[in-house]
Amino acid sequence: MNIVDQQTFRDAMSCMGAAVNIITTDGPAGRAGFTASAVCSVTDTPPTLLVCLNRGASVWPVFNENRTLCVNTLSAGQEPLSNLFGGKTPMEHRFAAARWQTGVTGCPQLEEALVSFDCRISQVVSVGTHDILFCAIEAIHRHATPYGLVWFDRSYHALMRPAC
């Protein structure tokens, strides 16, 4: 059996561009958020996406208890916010750095996000160090900004919507 080592896997994954997202929650366990690129569509019937979350992350217990989350997809220019939510900054400072609305699930929804998916966690599957959170989408909010933000080759890149 050929086992791929961790560094080879990580180097190869850096070749896969992905949207940059801030995942937020609020509920009985408190308010929390983190930056994630491990987010993708599962199905449109019913509308479902998935988010991967390391069980060793400081935010894991909060998301695990609240069972709701909002995927806030960032637009170009929001790199500092991504870095803030991706570090060890206290939660109150993370949330103070942007404007938020409360979504239908009670989760913080970033006002200037490219798109926000307000969700309830419907299923959790554990694989290795991570939980895969399957999220039933209850509401979607889109912003008119024409620029997206992706993480590719270990750095941020802006994308522009084509003119119609």
From Swiss-Prot:
Gene3D superfamilies attached to this UniProt entry: Electron Transport, Fmn-binding Protein, Chain A
EC number(s) recorded for this UniProt protein: 1.5.1.42
Record keyword Oxidoreductase present: yes
Keyword annotations of the record: Flavoprotein, FMN, NAD, Oxidoreductase
Pfam families documented for this protein: Flavin_Reduct
Inducing factors: Up-regulated by the nitrogen regulatory protein C (NtrC also called GlnG) and repressed by RutR.
GO MF term set: FMN binding; FMN reductase (NADH) activity; FMN reductase [NAD(P)H] activity; riboflavin reductase (NADPH) activity
GO biological process: nitrogen utilization; uracil catabolic process
InterPro entries: Flavin_Rdtase-like_dom (IPR002563), NADH-dep_flavin_reductase (IPR050268), RutF (IPR019917), Split_barrel_FMN-bd (IPR012349)
Catalytically driven reaction(s): FMNH2 + NAD(+) = FMN + NADH + 2 H(+)
UniProt xrefs under PANTHER family: FLAVIN REDUCTASE, FMN REDUCTASE (NADH) RUTF
Similarity remark: Belongs to the non-flavoprotein flavin reductase family. RutF subfamily.
Function: Catalyzes the reduction of FMN to FMNH2 which is used to reduce pyrimidine by RutA via the Rut pathway.
Protein name: FMN reductase (NADH) RutF
Native organism: Escherichia coli O139:H28 (strain E24377A / ETEC)
